[in-house]
C-alpha cells in the first residue's frame, strides 16, 4: 500500500471531522489551527484545504479562514436524486459485462458493512462509499467515477445528521440494501438490483426529510 502523504493525511483528518459532525456548517477553520492539530508545516495544510474547497466541502474566506459550507435541504435532495440517475445508469451499463469476480467482491464489501455494528459516522460512511464507488466503477467510466466520488464527498456535510437520526429511530439500513443489490445481480435481475440501489440512496433523503419536518 502506498504511504499516505502529509497532504492526504490532513485532508482525510478534516474530512473525517466534518463527516462525524465535529466541524459543523459555517464553522471556520484556520491554517494555524490545522497546523497545530496535525503537527505539520503550512504547505500540506494549505494544499489539503485547497482540495477540500475544490471538492465543495469548504469555502475560502479571505482574511478569515476556511468555512464549512452550509447545505440546504434542496441541495441535499438534488445531490441524492442526481446520484440515483448516475448510479442506476452506471449499473445498467455495466450489467452485461459483470463477472462472477465482480459480484463476489461486491458481496464481500456488502457483508463487511452489515457485519460491523459500530456507531461511528465516518466508518459507516466510508463503507457506504466503498460499495457505491466500486459498483459504479464497473462500467469503466473514469469521469463518472470522479464525479460520483465528489458527490459522495459533498454528502459528508450532512451525513452525520442522517446516521444519528437513523440510529436513534432504529431506522438505519446497515447495508441490507447493498446485500439485496448483490442478491439481485447474482440472479441476473437488473430491474430488482436497480430498485434496491435506488432505495438505498433515497433512504438518506427520506430520513433527512423526516428530521427536517420534526425540527420545523
Segments predicted by a language model, with ranges:
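Conserved amphipathic alpha-helical segments that form helical-bundle/coiled-coil interaction surfaces
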Residues: 100-162, 174-184, 190-203
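C-terminal effector-binding regulatory domain of bacterial HTH transcription factors
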Residues: 1, 192-216
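A ubiquitous short alpha-helical element
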Residues: 71-76, 94-97, 115-120, 161-168
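Juxtamembrane/interface motifs at transmembrane-helix termini
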Residues: 46-47, 97-100, 124-127, 165-169, ...
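Short linear motifs at protein or domain termini
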Residues: 1-96, 210-216
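Residue-level recognition of short, well-ordered coil/turn positions
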Residues: 22, 57, 121, 189-190
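Short helix-capping and inter-helix turn/linker motifs at the boundaries of alpha-helical repeat units
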Residues: 5, 104, 169-173
Amino acid at each position: 500500500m502506498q504511504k499516505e502523504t502529509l497532504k492526504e493525511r490532513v485532508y482525510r483528518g478534516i474530512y473525517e471531522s466534518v463527516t462525524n459532525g465535529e466541524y459543523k456548517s459555517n464553522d471556520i477553520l484556520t491554517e494555524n489551527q490545522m497546523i497545530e492539530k496535525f503537527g505539520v508545516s503550512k504547505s500540506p495544510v494549505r494544499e489539503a484545504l485547497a482540495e477540500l474547497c475544490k471538492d465543495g466541502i469548504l469555502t475560502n474566506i479571505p482574511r478569515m479562514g476556511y468555512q464549512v459550507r452550509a447545505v440546504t435541504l434542496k441541495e441535499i435532495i438534488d445531490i441524492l436524486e442526481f446520484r440515483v440517475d448516475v448510479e442506476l445508469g452506471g449499473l445498467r451499463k455495466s450489467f452485461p459485462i459483470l463477472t462472477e469476480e465482480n459480484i463476489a467482491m461486491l458481496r464481500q464489501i456488502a457483508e463487511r458493512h452489515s457485519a460491523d455494528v459500530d456507531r461511528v459516522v465516518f466508518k459507516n460512511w466510508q463503507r457506504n462509499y466503498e460499495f457505491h464507488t466500486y459498483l459504479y466503477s464497473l462500467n469503466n467510466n473514469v469521469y463518472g467515477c470522479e464525479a460520483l466520488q465528489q458527490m459522495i464527498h459533498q454528502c459528508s456535510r450532512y451525513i452525520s445528521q442522517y446516521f444519528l437520526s437513523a440510529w436513534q429511530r432504529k431506522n438505519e439500513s446497515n447495508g441490507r440494501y447493498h446485500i439485496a443489490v448483490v442478491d439481485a445481480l447474482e440472479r441476473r435481475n437488473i430491474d430488482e438490483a436497480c430498485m434496491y440501489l435506488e432505495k438505498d440512496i433515497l433512504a438518506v433523503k427520506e430520513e433527512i426529510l423526516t428530521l427536517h419536518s420534526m425540527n420545523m
